[in-house]
Amino acid sequence: PVLLAAWLSFSMSEVRGLTKSKSINGEYITIREVVVDVGKETKRKDMGKTPTRNRRHRIPPYIKELIDKVDGDVLVPISGRALYHRWIKLQDENGMAHITFHDLRHLSASIMALLRIPDKYAQERGGWKSDKVMKKVYMQTFSEEREKVDNIIDSYFEKIVEPEEDG
């Protein structure tokens, strides 16, 4: 779940809505549903907050390997509360200062800025609809340029999750 948020800029409700049957198509993952907790009830919805949130990303090979290891259809079959507590525990076990799960989307945006990903592509990847959050996407992106952007971001994260061995 953490890599889906930090690497692909998915929110907790988007991560919880991912399924192998509806979200995965070949080497792409698409936000088709979200899962939210309303009181004590869990609700699966066909759409995120806005149409721009229903977006598609190429699945980085490292994340694809993790997805392939998941039993069943639902990629993250736990409640929002359980996910939150596991995230806090992971931070504690690794001596990290606490950040919220949502902060991982901010991290994703910051990493894209650090890598000098054009705002237009960063906004598309993050699913932000207005320039008050990022910048508006009015023009279509070119798939060749988008592929270059995806390669830059994938390369950055792959170096983190698969560090080169010394010697």
Describe the residue ranges of each PLM region.
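Short, polar N-cap/turn motifs at the start of nucleic acid-interacting alpha helices
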Residues: 23-28, 117-137
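Short, charged phosphate-coordinating catalytic segments
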Residues: 3-33, 120
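Active-site-proximal segment of tyrosine recombinases
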Residues: 14-16, 99-100, 109, 116-128
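Catalytic-site neighborhood detector that most strongly recognizes the C-terminal catalytic loop/helix
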Residues: 35, 64, 126-151
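Short, cationic motifs built from Arg/Lys/His that form the positively charged side of catalytic pockets
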Residues: 10-13, 55, 105
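Short helix-to-turn junction characteristic of helix-turn-helix DNA-binding domains
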Residues: 1, 5, 112-113
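Active-site/catalytic core of tyrosine-dependent DNA strand-transfer enzymes
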Residues: 33, 58-97
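C-terminal secondary-structure termini that scaffold catalytic or DNA-interacting sites
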Residues: 39, 44-62, 151-167
